[in-house]
């Protein structure tokens, strides 16, 4: 995998503020490539960055990450949908293209 691409993805993920999330697709729109490429970078190199702040477009994480991510969301005050436990993407989404 291109080292420059990996660095771009990880730098974008580091910019996501606590209590907010972005999507694989939103990161890909800025870094280039596609959501699956971003997912591959996160799987291989994402340990040192706040990986729980990058989620699927529907506000879910892969089940293997759910418990650890939920603890981070609660600690950071990330908006969750009541009852479902998934992220409230309308309130939690942060766009790396605009910084909002």
Residue ranges, per PLM feature:
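Nucleic acid-binding interface residues in structured DNA/RNA-binding domains
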Residues: 1-100
